[in-house]
Amino acid sequence: MTHRRATLCAMASVALVSAAQLGMRWSMSRLPSPVQWLEMQEHAQLDLSALRVVCASITAYALSMLFWLLALRVLPLSRAYSLLSISYALVYTLAATLPFFHETFTVSKTVGVSLIVAGVLTINLRRLPRPSPQDLSHENQRFR
């Protein structure tokens, strides 16, 4: 897998985990405590659309993990891990932008998220050193 494809896998992981967070937040604001779900389902009082979103969010978490594992095969952990921070910025921005979350932008949160994004850019915009041919042959022998 190429570095570019691994970065795309990491970004797919970020998008999926962000969607899962937003889905969980939306669902859980419409559902009772999970320990009450079975009791409420018996009385047909459970919001099934919200429960479906919980299930979809759990699936998104699982897919996110799969993409994350693929990304980690190639990306250095120091760079890959910083990409996860983009999720904080994405969730904050979407939660404050989409009206059904009833979240607001604040100066302190926006400054904090801006610092996170600046940190991710600082870490990831530096070019990675190219591995030498000796490093590549050693790496290939390791997998034989």
From Swiss-Prot:
Main function: Translocates 4-amino-4-deoxy-L-arabinose-phosphoundecaprenol (alpha-L-Ara4N-phosphoundecaprenol) from the cytoplasmic to the periplasmic side of the inner membrane.
Name listed for the protein in its UniProt record: Probable 4-amino-4-deoxy-L-arabinose-phosphoundecaprenol flippase subunit ArnF
Organism field: Pseudomonas syringae pv. syringae (strain B728a)
Gene: arnF
TM helices/strands, residue ranges: 7-24, 57-77, 81-101, 105-125
Keywords: Cell inner membrane, Cell membrane, Lipid A biosynthesis, Lipid biosynthesis, Lipid metabolism, Lipopolysaccharide biosynthesis, Membrane, Transmembrane, Transmembrane helix, Transport
Membrane topology of this protein: Multi-pass membrane protein
Family indicated by similarity: Belongs to the ArnF family.
Subcellular localization: Cell inner membrane
GO cellular component: plasma membrane
KW Endoplasmic reticulum (keyword) present: no
